[in-house]
């Protein structure tokens, strides 16, 4: 139970920091005018409402930094809004982000936007089907952010979980406002014996945050 309480406490603190930073533009988490300009432009052009909220973006940044994540995978990059936030966190953690986007136009936009925001050195955008591209990537992942087609969430989790490092974090978007589209996934992460999962909602969309325990499954379930 101690590990679970610690994990939830960390997530709550991260969410609180995000809330304070969003309310205080002079905080240490403030963005440069160039980054703010790029993020505003993405939002203005986001007619399909594919980008995460600013609050969710800030949450991702702090989570990457707090986890000291070195290898970060984003599944569903859209036009690069969340990738920029992940990249800002990766700059602080010394990590690298691989962001995969299926749609060719959005993938081009994402690559251009991360470059304009100044995080192109830590964020690599790949255009293609994530189911085909993920097996090509080497190594393991410290943090995975999933924001793709919701009925595919369970399939993506099954593919990526074996490559999530012990102590790694799996984050999924829209688990509150689109929960009916991903019920098999939600059942899995909430009952998995090797995960500690909590749901947070910096905005109304909601994110699941699942920590892969370092304990064997038969011991982790006793948490």
Regions found by a protein language model. Name each.
Residues 2, 6, 20-145, 150-171, ...:
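A short alpha-helical cap/connector motif
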Residues 8-19:
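Bacterial N-terminal signal peptides
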């Amino acid at each position: 139970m101690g590990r679970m309480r610690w994990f939830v406490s960390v997530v709550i603190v991260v969410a609180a920091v995000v809330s304070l930073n969003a309310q205080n533009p002079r905080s240490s988490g403030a963005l440069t005018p160039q980054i703010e300009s790029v993020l505003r432009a993405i939002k203005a052009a986001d007619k399909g409402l594919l980008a995460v909220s600013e609050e969710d973006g800030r949450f991702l940044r702090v989570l990457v930094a707090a986890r000291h994540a070195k290898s970060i995978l984003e599944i569903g990059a859209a036009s690069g809004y969340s990738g920029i936030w992940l990249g800002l966190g990766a700059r602080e953690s010394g990590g690298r982000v691989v962001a995969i986007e299926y749609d060719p136009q959005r993938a081009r936009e994402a690559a251009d936007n991360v470059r304009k925001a100044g995080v192109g050195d830590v964020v690599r955008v790949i255009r293609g089907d994530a189911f085909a591209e993920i097996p090509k990537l080497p190594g393991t992942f410290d943090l995975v952010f999933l924001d793709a087609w919701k009925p595919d969430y369970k399939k993506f989790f099954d593919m990526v979980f074996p490559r999530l490092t012990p102590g790694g974090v799996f984050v999924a978007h829209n688990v509150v406002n689109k929960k009916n589209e991903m019920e098999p996934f939600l059942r899995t992460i909430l009952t998995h014996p090797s995960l500690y999962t909590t749901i947070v909602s910096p905005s109304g969309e909601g994110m699941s945050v699942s920590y892969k325990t370092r304990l064997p499954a038969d011991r982790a379930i006793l948490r």
